Amino acid sequence: MVAKPVIFVVSDSVGETADLVTRAALSQWGQRSVEIRRFPMIDDPQSLREVIDAARQQPTLIVYTIIVPEIRKELQRLVDMWDIPAVDIMGPMLDGISRLLGAPEKLEPGRIHRLDDDYFRRIEAVEFAVKYDDGKDPRGFLRADAVLIGVSRSSKTPVSMYLAHRRYKVANLPLVPEVSLPKELFLVPPHKVVGLRVSPEKLHQIREERIKTIGLRSDANYSSMERILQELDYAESVFKKVGCAVIDVTNKAVEETAVRVLEIINRGVNFGD
């Protein structure tokens, strides 16, 4: 049996920067199955050797953000020795900026993630997105920077989490014909509500993949075109009733949709595209 490919995210801090870059790059390959394993706080030679030993056991790419020069050089030596592919995320950037400014970097792992007010705002936003995901508690709509509405599998949750990592508090609500709309939705200023629209064909494809993943029958009503059209018609009626802007997410990446959401809520305007 061929071993599953894996990416080791290695850092002498928390590893978030390397993890985000890795996931952004992986998105170019769609749904390919690649495991990501994060190894934070690798700041001594022994810990580093343990990571390398694990990487040698299977097809592995090492992606790393190592600030301390001695640890970075040792990692480079080990991956060269064992012929393990590796990508240095921070090294070339640090060297380039150092040459530009004519001054060395401060060499403080985790400096970018210091526990300042900005960091805590992001944590708070992520917790908010989790708590008010999928319409769990509509009371959160009134505290949100944005409320995303749309049918199931229209990328509401991924966009909410993406914006949360940029310190925006985002709630979302699935639109289901059989479920009444919460009164709180109509108390939110319309420019803070954003509808997510997706084509029937794309939604059918996404839902077919979803039911395969969770083991439902392929003829489940959830992915039938008749049901999809019914839900999309209902969603359009809700968009009009609320008076919100609408984004067509059919061919948009999560990042693109998030940018459009910010344009809408920051300008305070209602318009569709």
Curated annotation (Swiss-Prot):
Q: Does the keyword field hold rRNA-binding?
A: no
* Documented EC number(s): 2.7.11.32, 2.7.4.27
Q: Which UniProt keywords apply?
A: Kinase, Nucleotide-binding, Serine/threonine-protein kinase, Transferase
Provide the binding site for ADP: 150-157
Q: Which Pfam families match?
A: Kinase-PPPase (PF03618)
Q: Does the keyword Nucleotide-binding apply?
A: yes
Recorded GO terms, molecular function?
ADP binding; ATP binding; phosphotransferase activity, phosphate group as acceptor; protein serine/threonine kinase activity
Source domain of life:
Bacteria
Q: Which reaction does it catalyse?
A: N(tele)-phospho-L-histidyl/L-threonyl-[pyruvate, phosphate dikinase] + ADP = N(tele)-phospho-L-histidyl/O-phospho-L-threonyl-[pyruvate, phosphate dikinase] + AMP + H(+); N(tele)-phospho-L-histidyl/O-phospho-L-threonyl-[pyruvate, phosphate dikinase] + phosphate + H(+) = N(tele)-phospho-L-histidyl/L-threonyl-[pyruvate, phosphate dikinase] + diphosphate
Task: Give the EC class as a word.
Answer: transferase
Family in the record: Belongs to the pyruvate, phosphate/water dikinase regulatory protein family. PDRP subfamily.
- Give a short account of what the protein does: Bifunctional serine/threonine kinase and phosphorylase involved in the regulation of the pyruvate, phosphate dikinase (PPDK) by catalyzing its phosphorylation/dephosphorylation.
Q: What is this protein called?
A: Putative pyruvate, phosphate dikinase regulatory protein
Give the organism the record lists: Symbiobacterium thermophilum (strain DSM 24528 / JCM 14929 / IAM 14863 / T)
